[in-house]
C-alpha cells in the first residue's frame, strides 16, 4: 500500500489512522456472536428504537462506539449532542438547572434529539431487555420444533456460537410461489393470525420502477421474496398465543396443499 494513500478528513479519522468501520445495527440490538454483542465490534454502531423494533422508544435510536486511543469519549458525546439539537450548547434542562441561562448555537445542525419521555420508555424496557430477548428465543424454539418436518426453510437464529436479536421469524414455502404465499396470508388472517412479508424488493416499488429498475433483472431477490411469510412474534404474546399460531399454520398449510392436489 502506498504511504499516505489514506487521507483523514476529520480529527476522528486521523486518530484511527484508517477507514472507520460503522455498523448498521438497526434490528440487531442484543445480537451476539462468539461472545461479543452487536455494538462492541465495529468502531461505531447505530441502533434503531422505532416502534417495530424489539426494544422501542416509539421513535429514535442510539449510537455506540468502542474506546480508541486518541478519541476523547466525552468530547465525542458532546459532538453528538450538538449534532442532534440544532448545534445548541445547552438543552432545556441544562438552561434551567445551571448557573446561567446563557447558551450558544455553534453550527447549523439537525433537530433529532430524543424527547425525555421517550427516553424514559426506553430505559424501562432496557432494564428487562434480557427477559424480552429470552422469551423471543423460546418462541423461536417452539416454532422451529413445530415446523422441522415441514417443507419449509427457516432462518437460523441461534447456535452454540451466536444468537440473533430474534427480531423476525419468517418461513419460506419451498417449491411454492407468490400465489400460494398470498392465499396463505389471507387464510391466516381469517383465523385471527396477522402475518407479514419482509421485505418487498426495491425494484418492485414504484419509486424505483420509475427510475428504470426491473425486478426481472434481480431473480434471486424475487425468488427469496415470492414465497416468504413472517409469523407473529412479540413480547406481548403468550406461549399459548404462539401455540395457536402453530396450530393455525399447520391447519392452513394442510388445507392449501390439499387444494393443489
What is the predicted function of each stretch?
Residues 46-47, 55-56, 61-64, 112, ...:
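Short glycine- and hydrophobic/aromatic-rich loop-to-beta-strand nucleating segment
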Residues 38-40, 63-65, 213-216:
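Short, hinge-like loop/turn segments at secondary-structure boundaries
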Residues 40-42, 50, 56-59, 164-166, ...:
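Short, solvent-exposed loop/turn segments at the edges of secondary structure
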Residues 1-16, 32, 68-261:
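PLP-dependent aminotransferase class I/II
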Residues 35-38, 60-62, 245-246:
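Short, glycine/charged-enriched secondary-structure capping and boundary segments
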Residues 2-55, 101-105:
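Conserved active-site segment immediately N-terminal to the catalytic lysine
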Residues 25-28, 60, 117:
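Generic detector of well-ordered alpha-helical packing
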Amino acid at each position: 500500500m502506498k504511504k499516505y494513500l489514506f487521507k483523514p478528513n476529520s480529527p476522528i479519522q486521523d486518530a484511527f489512522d484508517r477507514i472507520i468501520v460503522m455498523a448498521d445495527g438497526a434490528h440487531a440490538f442484543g445480537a451476539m456472536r462468539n461472545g461479543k454483542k452487536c455494538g462492541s465490534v465495529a468502531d461505531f454502531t447505530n441502533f434503531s428504537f422505532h416502534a417495530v423494533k424489539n426494544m422501542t422508544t416509539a421513535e429514535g435510536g442510539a449510537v455506540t462506539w468502542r474506546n480508541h486511543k486518541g478519541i476523547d469519549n466525552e468530547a465525542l458525546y458532546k459532538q453528538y449532542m450538538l449534532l442532534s439539537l440544532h448545534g445548541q450548547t445547552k438543552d432545556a434542562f441544562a438552561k434551567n438547572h445551571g448557573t446561567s441561562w446563557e447558551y450558544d448555537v455553534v453550527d447549523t445542525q439537525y433537530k433529532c434529539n430524543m424527547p425525555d419521555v421517550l427516553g424514559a420508555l426506553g430505559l424501562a424496557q432496557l432494564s428487562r431487555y434480557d427477559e424480552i430477548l429470552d422469551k423471543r428465543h423460546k418462541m423461536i424454539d417452539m416454532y422451529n420444533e413445530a415446523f422441522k418436518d415441514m417443507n419449509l426453510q427457516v432462518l437460523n437464529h441461534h447456535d452454540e456460537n451466536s444468537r440473533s436479536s430474534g427480531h423476525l421469524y419468517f418461513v419460506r414455502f419451498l417449491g411454492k410461489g407468490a400465489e400460494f404465499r398470498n392465499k396463505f396470508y389471507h387464510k391466516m388472517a381469517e383465523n385471527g393470525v396477522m402475518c407479514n412479508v419482509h421485505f418487498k424488493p426495491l425494484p418492485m416499488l414504484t419509486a424505483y420502477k420509475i427510475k428504470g429498475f426491473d425486478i426481472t433483472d434481480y431473480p434471486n431477490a424475487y425468488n427469496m421474496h415470492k414465497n416468504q411469510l413472517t409469523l407473529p412474534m412479540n413480547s406481548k404474546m403468550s406461549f399459548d398465543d404462539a401455540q395457536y399460531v402453530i396450530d393455525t399454520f399447520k391447519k392452513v398449510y394442510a388445507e392449501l396443499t390439499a387444494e393443489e392436489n
